[in-house]
Amino acid sequence: MSRYRITTLALVSLLLPTAWPSAQAGRGTQQRPAAAAPALRPPARADILRGEYGKHRANNDLLYYQLDIRIDPDQRFISGKNTVRFRMLEDDTRIQLDLYANLNVDRITLGERELTYEREINAVFIDFPETLRKGREYSIDFYYSGTPQEKGRFGGIAFRKDPNGKHWINTACEGEGSSIWWPSKDQWRDEPAGMRLSVAIPNDLVDVSNGKFVGKTDLGDGYTRWDWLVQYPINSYNVSLNIGDYVHFGDRSGDLPLDFYVLPGSLEKAQKQFAQAKPMIEIYEDIFGEYPFAKDGYKLIEVPYSGMEHQSAVTYGNRFANGYLERDWTGVGISPKFDFIIIHESAREWFGNAVSAADVSDMWIQEGWTTYLEALYVERRFGPEDALKYINAYKSKVGNRQPVITQRGIHRTPTQDMYFKGALFLHTLRSVVNDDEKWWRVIRDFYQRFKYQNIMTEDMIRFFNAELKQDLTPIFDQYLRRADLPTLELAFDAEGGPLAYRWRADERAFAMPIRVGGPEKWEILRPTTDWQLTKAPMPKDSFEVATDLYYVNVVKQ
């Protein structure tokens, strides 16, 4: 998406008197003020217990989960245990795990010894009779049972029937949390290095979960146990069940197995629609590197909701049609060229599952990057012109009423701007870099540097500042920590004199170069938050700003 004939605009810096803007007020119309941001409700105790990485979470490091459960679909009942292996980072006698209050804690054991615990809302504080020592590894068995509640957009865990009346059970709990259906360390910062899932269900059903399928065992009581092995770090909300009357077909992308699971009546449609997965994976591998969960494979699984990015087990409910739920998602004719759910949810394998946010407040690292990856897919698949149309269409979806990054330590999903403003910020940053070869290298290196890690925005800022050898912190902060967009103020002289210009931004140090002039000869203007003058006159009528390459407001006076 590069522009041509880019030069640096000659200018002279001049700190203008504060009266300058009002003296020019008659030359244009000021931007309409944005609507006031809605007041945020005070965090509930449950939000803090879920979101805070407090003492009894921070004192240990997850190593491994072994989740062994049994599901009775008729009774909507789940029972089993999670074996949790962890290493202590500090001496202590208590750790925190999580399980929704409506589910029973049957018992928690360390070896043969039953442990005491205290429940507060959905938190479970587990006490040990002796001090757990820093550096040592421990393993506990957490037995539980109950009827999970359905909650949230996709149910958290939902018990449904398919069109043929057979049981169809699916989990999708990014917002609600893994503890809605299984005991876990239900937060974003700490992930086990891997896990094993064993799911016992009636013989006529199939379970598709995360990781590599390692076998099934007939238990002799009308139930079959399905075993899956996850060989990479995984966030607890990504752990998933997909239980139903599934049929399977497959493909390969090089050495990577592509496994597809759908209901029998969907097979013919899926064989056609799911063909989009292979070129999508090839495009993302070309940009960022190998598919991050190669040993576990890639799965695409039909579900009764729109879709979710479950690691190595991406779920799909987009009606086997291009666009999003048979709509032109961006309204500019590009979305109908591809299946939005396949492209978006699979992109989360790279950003969200491999590179993960360490706190829900930084969720834009997952959703903003993934939305930007949609545009990169369009660029590689359909060309730069379509990519520009596609990403600029996201501007209409941004509210700019609250910051993208929210308060840390509170489990509160940020504004939906994290998707669209996050993507448009990255699109803008590419134009700031103004060197596509460098941009492709930096984003690939960023991904490779933080693959299989949980990070915060500060980690990204430090990386980009070091790689690009400039301080981009004020630009990051204006777009992500402030609600308002930066506004480029242009004050033209009525008598044909020099142009006065500056950024109006909340970040005092905000200084972002931007392309101006016109398509025949774009030039780089370097505004700061102080007024400056160009050396040469600038005609108002023919003066353009490359707003398709930057997400900014422009006010001409």
Predicted features by range, described:
Residues 81-102, 183-187, 192-202, 458, ...:
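Surface-exposed beta-strand/loop patches in extracellular or lumenal glycoproteins
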Residues 231, 363, 367-428, 432, ...:
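Acidic/His/Gly-enriched intrinsically disordered linker/tail segments
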Residues 104-110, 208, 472-473, 488, ...:
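Beta-strand-rich binding/interaction modules
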Residues 80, 171-174, 185-343:
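Hydrophobic helix-coil surface modules that form long, contiguous segments used
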Residues 33, 100-161, 221-222, 532-538:
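A surface-exposed beta-strand-loop module
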